């Protein structure tokens, strides 16, 4: 089948945007390339780069945020560690849909998982002087690799495609046994590849993270969107697969952007395991005066980055978490629009970015 977009046009567009390696481009760069090629070629593209199929935001979140604004929350700085309703409802949401116990104290709001991850890369790379490298299990979000470059943090990566099932353990251990990996990051499910790690693979990641004392950063942007399973029923199996069942060294990044279509308000949580939350790191204490992981994450890194997440948006996220855990908001059903999009992506010879 002939290419619908001439290679020359594609190459010229990359050159015009100063992109040397398209595989390493950020999501925003990919979107810009797609937009330009659409305009120049007159060919319609299937856009998956932003992962937003145009769904409306959840009404319960909008109403809760409107109420918070009407009550004057916009004039008040939020607690850097999060408002109490969000912390408690986030903890309950994690239990309802992952069957994992995380104390409210470990659920900390961030300005989207973008900021949450940015600050996690910083703190994880500073916990132990011997561990200064972030390991990416690809495919992931390209901008996260951009973040570690901006921060000057060392990083390694490998593609999960060639190391599924029993091949994952030896490959992952080949990096961890070097002793310099501070954290492992991956997305599950991943967009636009729509690769879902299996329970067995997540067990491998969790057990090796414990063995080598490495922190797992699990990005759950598309939580519940493995539509082959009947996920999304609160407090009932099957639950979202997670490495958190197999290690205490984890942070779950849960964003409102995709699961609640609340991307514009930039609100998420970092759910830190109880053990990691209270773990004391001498290097953090020496550098910042705060040695416990979660306390340092919030009061040092997040505080310096934004002085807190949007006050009113925290009320929105709390309300959506509560409605979902109460069984009144079926966010998995509401996001099922992703299913035909991902199916089209994986089965049709469509031009997509």
Could you describe each region identified by the protein language model?
Residues 47-49, 185-187, 217, 254, ...:
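Short beta-strand segments
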Residues 58-61, 227-231, 263-266:
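Short aromatic-enriched loop/helix-cap "lid" or pocket-rim segments at secondary-structure transitions
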Residues 344-353:
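Conserved small/polar residues in nucleotide/adenosyl-binding loops
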Residues 245-336:
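Conserved core segment of the aminotransferase class I/II
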Residues 73-212, 217, 223-246, 251:
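Conserved core of the PLP fold type I
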Residues 4-10, 17-115, 321:
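N-terminal small-domain helix-loop-helix segment of the aminotransferase-like
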Residues 28, 84, 88, 142, ...:
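A structural signal for well-ordered alpha-helical segments within the folded catalytic domains
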Residues 51-55, 83, 114, 141-142, ...:
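Short, solvent-exposed loop/turn segments at secondary-structure junctions
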């Amino acid at each position: 089948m002939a290419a619908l977009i001439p290679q020359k046009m594609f190459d010229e567009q990359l050159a015009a945007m100063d992109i040397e390696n398209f595989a390493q481009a950020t999501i925003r760069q990919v979107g810009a390339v797609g937009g330009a090629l659409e305009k120049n070629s007159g060919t319609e593209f299937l856009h998956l780069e932003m992962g937003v199929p145009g769904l409306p935001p959840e009404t319960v979140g909008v109403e809760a945020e409107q109420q918070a604004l009407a009550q004057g929350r916009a004039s008040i700085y939020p607690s850097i560690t999060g408002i109490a309703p969000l912390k408690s409802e986030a903890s309950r949401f994690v239990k309802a849909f992952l069957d994992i116990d995380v104390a409210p104290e470990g659920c900390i709001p961030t300005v989207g998982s973008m900021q949450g991850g940015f600050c996690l890369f910083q703190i994880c790379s500073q916990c132990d002087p011997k561990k200064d490298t972030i390991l990416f299990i690809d495919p992931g979000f390209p901008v996260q690799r951009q973040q570690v470059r901006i921060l000057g943090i060392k990083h390694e990566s490998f593609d999960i495609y060639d190391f599924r099932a029993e091949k994952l353990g030896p490959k992952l251990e080949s990096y961890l046994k070097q002793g310099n990996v501070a954290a492992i990051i991956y997305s599950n499910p991943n967009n636009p590849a729509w690769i879902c790690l299996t329970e067995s693979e997540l067990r491998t990641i969790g057990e090796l993270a414990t063995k080598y004392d490495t922190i797992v950063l699990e990005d759950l942007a598309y939580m519940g969107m493995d539509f082959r399973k009947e996920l999304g029923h609160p407090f009932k199996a099957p639950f979202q697969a997670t490495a958190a069942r197999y290690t205490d060294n984890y942070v779950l990044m849960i964003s409102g952007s995709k699961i609640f279509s609340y991307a514009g308000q930039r609100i998420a949580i970092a759910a830190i395991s109880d053990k990691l939350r209270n773990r004391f790191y001498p290097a953090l204490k020496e550098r910042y005066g705060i040695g416990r992981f979660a306390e340092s994450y919030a009061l040092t890194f997040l505080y310096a980055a934004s002085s807190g997440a949007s006050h009113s948006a925290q009320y929105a996220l709390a309300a959506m978490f509560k409605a979902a855990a109460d069984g009144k908001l079926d966010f998995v059903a509401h996001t099922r629009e992703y299913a035909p999009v991902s199916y089209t992506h994986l089965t049709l010879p469509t031009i997509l970015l």
